[in-house]
UniProtKB/Swiss-Prot annotation:
The keyword RNA-binding applies. GO terms for biological process: ribosomal large subunit assembly; translation. One of its GO terms (molecular function) is structural constituent of ribosome. It comes from Methanoregula boonei (strain DSM 21154 / JCM 14090 / 6A8). Part of the 50S ribosomal subunit. Contacts the 5S and 23S rRNAs. This is one of the proteins that bind and probably mediate the attachment of the 5S RNA into the large ribosomal subunit, where it forms part of the central protuberance. Belongs to the universal ribosomal protein uL18 family. The keyword Kinase does not apply. This is Large ribosomal subunit protein uL18. GO terms for cellular component: cytosolic large ribosomal subunit. CDD domains: Ribosomal_L18_L5e. Keywords: Ribonucleoprotein, Ribosomal protein, RNA-binding, rRNA-binding. It comes from the Archaea.
Length: 174
């Protein structure tokens, strides 16, 4: 296929569908640290990343698996876990001396109320300055896990658990 001087092969990460270089260029040119939110099937990962000539440098990282240390008993890939991971990320970023960032959701679809925006809400509630619009954030009921408790009797105490963990993380902010 790539035979001849007129054929241009796209970058490898673009061919694999792993990087949107148009979006990445806009984020890197902004010259501010990026709050990178990635979701997996089991966890939410939030990182503070700066772009350098040698490659991106991660300054601070928080993973939803760390929430167990604070007493969180729910699933680590849902909306309340994303919110709490954002809070934990803000606490770590504040300790590292960072107080602002811009959101990088990567190839995630920007659906209002999505888990990536729950992590954003957690980081903003934790004291980071990140530009955003109110219409994209999930409702308070979803951040606390009331939608989970409504259909699952076993998870009825998730609202209390989320509030306890949020209080424990906010203590760390002080």
């Amino acid at each position: 296929m790539a035979t001849g001087p007129r054929y241009l092969v796209a970058f490898r990460r673009r061919r694999e569908g792993r990087t949107d270089y148009y979006q990445r260029t806009k984020l890197v040119v902004a010259d501010a640290p990026r709050m990178v939110v990635r979701r997996t099937n089991r966890h939410i990962i939030v990182q503070l990343v700066t772009a350098e000539m040698e490659g991106d440098k991660t300054l601070v990282s928080a993973n939803s698996a760390e929430l167990e240390k604070y007493g969180y008993t729910g699933a680590t890939a849902n909306t309340p876990a994303a919110y709490l991971t954002g809070l934990l990320f803000a606490a770590k970023a504040k300790k590292a001396g960072q107080d602002s960032a811009i959101l990088d959701i990567g190839l995630n679809r920007a659906t209002p109320g999505a888990r990536v925006f729950a992590a954003l809400k957690g980081a903003v509630d934790g004291g980071l300055e990140i530009p955003y619009g109110e219409s994209i954030l999930p409702s308070e009921d979803r951040l606390k896990g009331e939608h989970i408790a409504a259909y699952n009797e076993k998870a009825g105490d998730i609202v209390k658990n989320v509030e306890q963990v949020a209080a424990a993380i906010k203590k760390e902010l002080v």
